[in-house]
């Protein structure tokens, strides 16, 4: 059995590029972002996240409130799931990594 984290692999270049791609949606002041909930920019960010999830082999669920749940099966069907949560939208003057770093870190 592998030690915890031994098989954890993060592609730093892909993570960085994904962050920068998302940052192009709704550019804000001083290098931040403005992807407020239910705006066109929020929808564009959600669409891009869906595309990345599809490429990673995830299935997607969306609840009545619009929360997205990306699910990827693990290699051990008896193992407990791992949950990671954050948000893709931002405050009006949100930072470039506001929420999205947690989302993409989980996907990575």
Model regions and ranges:
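N-terminal hydrophobic or amphipathic helices/low-complexity stretches enriched
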Residues: 1-31, 73
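Short coil/turn segments at secondary-structure junctions
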Residues: 6, 32-37, 90-93
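General structural feature for long, well-ordered alpha-helical segments within catalytic domains
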Residues: 11-18, 41, 45-49, 80
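Alpha-helical metal-binding/catalytic segments enriched in His/Glu/Asp
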Residues: 22, 84, 96-108
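A non-catalytic alpha/beta surface segment that caps or lines the substrate-entry region
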Residues: 28-73
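Short coil/turn connectors at secondary-structure junctions
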Residues: 56, 77-82
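Active-site nucleophile and cofactor-binding loops and adjacent substrate-binding regions
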Residues: 62-63, 92-100
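Glycine/charged-rich beta-loop-alpha catalytic/anionic-binding loops adjacent to active sites
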Residues: 80-93
């Amino acid at each position: 059995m592998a030690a915890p984290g031994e098989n954890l692999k993060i592609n730093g270049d892909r993570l960085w590029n994904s962050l920068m791609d998302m940052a192009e949606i709704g550019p804000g002041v001083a290098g931040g972002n403005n992807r407020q909930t239910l705006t066109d920019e929020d929808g564009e960010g959600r669409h891009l996240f869906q595309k990345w999830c599809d490429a990673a082999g995830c299935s997607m669920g969306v609840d009545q409130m619009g929360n997205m749940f990306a699910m990827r099966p693990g290699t051990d069907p008896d193992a407990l799931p791992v949950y990671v949560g954050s948000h893709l939208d931002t405050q009006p003057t949100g930072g470039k990594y506001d929420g999205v770093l947690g989302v993409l870190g989980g996907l990575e």
